[in-house]
Amino acid sequence: MAVKGSIVRISGPLVVAEGMSGAQMYEMVYVGEDRLIGEITRIRGDRAFIQVYESTSGLKPGEPVVGTGAPLSVELGPGLLGTIYDGVQRPLPIIAEKVAEVDPRRRMFVERGIQAPPLPRDRKFHFKPEPLKEGDKVEGGDALGRVPETSLIEHVVMVPPGIRGRLKWLASEGDYSVEDTIAVVERDGRDVEIRMHQRWPVRIPRPFKEKLEPQLPLITGVRIIDTFFPMAKGGTGAVPGGFGTGKTVTLHSLAQWSEARVVIYIGCGERGNEMTEVLERFPQYKDPWTGKPLMDRTVLIANTSNMPVAAREASIYVGITIAEYYRDMGYDVLLVADSTSRWAEALREIAGRLEEMPAEEGYPSYLASRLAEFYERAGRVKALGSPERSGSVTVVGAVSPPGGDFSEPVTSHTTRFIRVFWALDTKLAYSRHYPAINWLMSYSAYVDLVTQWWHENVDKRWREYRDEAMDILLRESELQEIVRLVGTEGLDEKDKMVLETARLIKDGFLKQNAFDPIDAFATPQKQFRLLKMIMDIHRKSLELIEKGVTTQQILQALGRLYIDIVKAKFTIPNDQLEKIDEIRDRALKALDELVSG
């Protein structure tokens, strides 16, 4: 029986209700006459402390609070992809239509207490059953059938985790809605109806058979990421950076061009116009791997800065639960959260309302454990059930440290749980070097794990060239200290060449225009050819210096070719890589003529 209490205190997004004996932690409740969605976060005696995921303006003591008897959950099934939700999985386009029916002038507002089913009830999906027969044993994760959800993704309809028994009936091929029963399983003498959709509590990670080592790179098309600081499928990463360093554009690039089959984009507490930009741009883009519309693989969760702060936490958990669901089907999923700092600020505000003892910079003492809960749900796994399949959830979170201070609590705690750190540098951004990822501060723990893939699929010398280029960039930063003191005249010719090659790496390889149709995405093969061209020229130059040629003579010999080398990244498409080799050969020939001529 549902618990029913009444409001005794209201403090912003926090509501205290009495008469709630029998309520459970994290139970979903309806608050007030408008039935606002809330979640119980603390119980003391018969009083429940509820964080409300909608505006509490106009609530008053004495209004009812009704429990649902279930935790905050999401609906999982066909129809998720291509949809935009708010922080508690309400479909915003449908809400806009509902509001417009009452008053067209209020179409742009989310009315308080408005409800809409997350999955479309009126849409039919074509269900094709698996070759199962009556009496077969089935368990959680087993595939019952498949539905072509979009042009890119085939949705696997699975037995919900925790259900095990004998298959009594399976629907034949045909068109069904998400509420239709598509199978009946006999479990302990009782019949369990399985619909095309299932519900899952957002705070509980979905189970899996086995966790696998993340050995496959997640190709993003961003050269500095894929070559120098690679992300693995099932990995965790953070993009910290101050104001204006390009966090959002970097995350948009990842969402647009990544090799992931499904992308979950969470706009958590950031500006509304950034989500609007995603909505305007994504439908126009094609998936680089298939040529199909990008929205066919994307779920957007919009919880912008002008929406209730409590829902920021819900949006993070809703997003990761949807990601785990597609992982269980055997897909590689990328979850992008922009930004986890806004979620942490929401935790700080609610902790203050709860009168909890503040820790560092006012954040609650459990900030680290909440961040860990989120990032630990990433990973590459062997999914439950049959047929056997593996999937992954890759999590990348933006961090917005005030003033670009990486020692603040959210950034410092995040670094404990992630293995890739793409540090955005204000100086690089202000000098118009984008992406502004600082190669001295950034790191990736996946370089050794993904090396084998690069060697087998691209070139066996990838690691050799990559490490050599990294050494040049590190050496250049040391030499810059000397140059500031005594100028370039105090350097020997080899060190001068290191400075020139480092400049070539930065201009011709690291800089990348996210809005250029050719330069926005570089295949692994193009990345390697560009790097190889620059490094082969560097090696040849060092040989010539040994023979007495000066750095100035080398640069003069290259002449206009220097510009061709820098421009190759945005003048040569991914399918014409032989032109990069032609530029390289012409450059090496010009250098050879310095000695032979």
UniProtKB/Swiss-Prot annotation:
The keyword ATP-binding applies. It holds the Pfam family ATP-synt_ab. ATP binds at G241, G242, F243, G244, T245, G246, K247, T248. It is a peripheral membrane protein. It catalyses: ATP + H2O + 4 H(+)(in) = ADP + phosphate + 5 H(+)(out). HAMAP family: ATP_synth_A_arch. Has multiple subunits with at least A(3), B(3), C, D, E, F, H, I and proteolipid K(x). Belongs to the ATPase alpha/beta chains family. This is A-type ATP synthase subunit A. The lineage of its organism: Archaea, Thermoproteota, Thermoprotei, Desulfurococcales, Desulfurococcaceae.
